[in-house]
Amino acid sequence: DRGYETYNIFAHVQEKGMYYLIRVKDGGGGSMTGSFDLPDENEFDHDMQLILTRKQTKDVKAKPKKFKFIAKSSPFDYLDLYDKKFYTLNFRVVRFAISEDSYESIITNLPKEDFPVEEIKKVYAMRWGIETSFRELKYAIGLCCFHSKKVEYIMQEIYARLILYNYCELITMHVI
């Protein structure tokens, strides 16, 4: 969910040949999309190509829509100051209505041909089951607090709680 929108995460997934679909803050100050050149519409599906760099040359500064400066303090594993000076990131920004006056913005590298906006909405909606499961695991089952200090015992607690969660889900499926 929100909070995962970093160029470093996008690049790691892209380098592994995998796909991502990440919700981002919807426009304005403090949002990743606030600096993008996006359509002036409520809903859109816009292809983006950014060239990330740690260099602040005249060319980079003159083309802020093409280049994105990454500060040295921001982690990005595919750039350095000497050998790898530029990294190209390709993705889509998809914005769609979730209610009459509320919108969600998604950044994804899923192919547009296979995943039009309606499919993106469906995939985005699928995450709710996963999110509610994590909430149950953290709070109802107690996965946010451990009693052990050693790694192997913490792992044992995690597995025990996962088994308990799955057992509880199995029981509730047959009762309800």
Tell me the role of every PLM-derived stretch:
Residues 2-176:
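Single, function-defining residue in the core of a domain
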